Curated annotation (Swiss-Prot):
Entry GO terms, CC: plasma membrane; side of membrane
Lipidation (GPI-anchor amidated glycine): G96
Name of the protein in question: Uncharacterized GPI-anchored protein SPAC750.07c
Signal sequence, start to end: 1-20
Subcellular location: Cell membrane
Membrane protein topology class: Lipid-anchor; GPI-anchor
Organism this protein belongs to: Schizosaccharomyces pombe (strain 972 / ATCC 24843) (Fission yeast)
Source species, domain of life: Eukaryota
Propiece residue ranges: 97-123
Keywords: Cell membrane, Glycoprotein, GPI-anchor, Lipoprotein, Membrane, Signal
Length: 123
């Protein structure tokens, strides 16, 4: 698979994990509208297509390269996609009935968010 597809799939996975932190603790009210849109896209099986379409949008009239697209998502897109509505279900599925496991998942998500912010601020 191409680096663009692999990068996009990784971002979908990471953003899905980070979603639960934002929606559960921080962004339920602020991001309800964005979350609803992303949830509908996800439920319709269109999340991947939505991300791919974003990658090939033009920026100042110049088509983005695959590398630039992945960089954009790592810097900014991950934070935006994390406002989706699917995260709590994912945490419940991964964590089962163990509160400890769920806490570990939340800690990982917080770290992902901090890394994303650091990458964004660095650029």
């Amino acid at each position: 698979m191409s680096p663009l597809i692999v990068g996009t799939l990784i971002i979908i996975l990471l953003s899905g994990l980070a979603t639960a932190f934002y929606v559960t603790w921080q962004g339920r009210l602020i991001c309800a509208g964005v979350g609803l849109i992303l949830e509908q896209a996800y439920e319709g099986g269109q999340m991947f297509n939505t991300l791919m379409a974003h990658c090939f949008e033009t920026y100042n009239g110049v088509e983005k390269s695959g590398t630039q697209c992945v960089a954009d998502w790592l810097k900014v897109g991950l934070l935006a996609v994390t406002f989706g509505a699917g995260g709590p279900r994912l945490v419940n599925t991964l964590g089962g009935s163990s509160p400890t496991t769920k806490r570990v998942i939340y800690i990982v998500m917080i770290l992902l968010v901090l890394i994303t912010l650091a990458v964004n601020l660095k650029h």
